[in-house]
Each structure stands twice: as C-alpha cells, then as structure tokens.
A protein has these predicted regions:
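Beta-rich carbohydrate-recognition and catalytic domains
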Residues: 1-8, 17-65, 69-120, 130-188, ...
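Conserved positions at the start
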Residues: 10-13, 63-66, 123-125, 193-195
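Solvent-exposed, flexible loop/coil residues
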Residues: 198
C-alpha cells in the first residue's frame, strides 16, 4: 500500500487494540545487548495521527511472544515468555496491569509462569482473546527439537482463569501436515507453523 508505514528490522508481527488504538508489535533482530550483537527485543507501536505509529514500549532483552489484551474493566493482560534461568527454553507467564506504563521490564520478567510443557519443549503465546469476563483464550505454539535437530512447531490453545490464576493444559489443534506444502525459510523449519489471525464466529466456534 503506497504511503503505508513500514517497520524495517521487525519480525514475528502481532497486533491488538488498547484504548481504541491499534498496537503493533514485533521482534527487532539483531540488536546489540552487552557483548551479544545478535540479540533480540520486542518493540510496540501505537496508532497515531495521520496513519502513523509511535513507539510506546520496548520489551525486556531477549524475550519474544509478549502479548497484550484489554480486559472489560480497562486493565491490560500481559502474556510473557521468559527463557533461561526462569523459563528454560520458553514458558508462558501472565500478569495484569492498569496501563502500558506499568508494563515495566521488572513486571514482565517476574510474572508468574504456567507449567505447560516438559523441559525439552517450549511454548509461546501468539494471540489472546476475551472469552468471558474472567476467561481468556490463548492461541499459541508448542515447539521442540526433533531427533535430526530440526524444529517442530504445533499450534495449540489453552484458557486462563483470571480469578484463580490457573490455566488449562495446552491442546494441540494443528500441525504442519494439516496445511498445503510450501517452501520453509530454512531446511530445519519444514515442520513449523506459527498460527495467528483467529476469527471468532460465535457459539464457541472460530476459524
């Protein structure tokens, strides 16, 4: 689209609406953090005037899959995905903040985590949907390394109960063979899907 804003260097885009404004997010790669010149970091841009977007938030270093969802009371659900000492290969956490200003690195990094998978696997949230006042549906991915060293990503869903802070177990809903064949970005990514754009149809149905 001629004249549309572009975001060079951003990967894995995501979108949500907060306070009636479009929020676009993505992973910037590479960025230099300390001595690591090939690190990554999420950035979020808010819809401004005349079709432009202004950067409003940068996520913690080396954390992907941060997602936001506005709740009925105006607060914001934050889905996190730390790795390393807290998260291993990748675990999903969540917290609720009053505004984006409160989504500080410390808050995001220390959000409580769900125990969704064994240590050799990892998970991440792709998008969140408000099901009822206190129930959140999450579309995400469950991933692992195969015996030949290549990656396997499957699409999964789970539900968060905001009252109890608990979640259901992830349920795999799709994998790569369910879709038409296509060229992967590299040979070790042939068995990978990264789902998004879920459209809710009502009566418990979606596509």
């Amino acid at each position: 689209i001629e004249g549309a804003p572009t975001f060079p260097g951003l990967q894995d885009p995501c979108v949500t609406i907060l306070d009636e404004k479009v929020i676009l997010g993505g992973v910037r790669f590479p960025v230099t953090i300390g001595e690591d010149s090939k690190a990554w970091q999420m950035e979020f841009y808010r819809e401004g005037l005349n079709g432009g977007f202004d950067k409003v938030l940068t996520g913690p270093p080396k954390m992907k899959d941060i997602r936001f969802l506005q709740l009925l009371d105006g607060r914001i659900l934050v889905l996190t995905r730390p790795q390393g000492e807290r998260g291993g290969r990748g675990r999903i956490g969540f917290c609720v903040v009053d505004s984006l200003i409160q989504a500080r690195w410390e808050t995001i990094e220390n959000a409580p985590l769900f125990d969704h998978c064994p240590e050799e696997q990892w998970v991440g949230a792709n998008e969140a949907h408000l099901l009822t006042k206190n129930k959140i549906g999450v579309l995400g991915h469950l991933a692992e390394f195969k015996e030949d060293g290549s990656r396997r990503y499957r699409s999964m869903v789970f539900c968060i109960d905001l009252e109890t802070g608990q979640s259901t177990e992830p349920e795999v809903i799709a994998e790569r063979p369910d879709f038409p064949s296509g060229a992967p970005k590299s040979p070790d990514w042939q068995d990978v899907i990264f789902s998004g754009g879920l459209l809710r149809l009502g009566r418990g149905q979606a596509r």
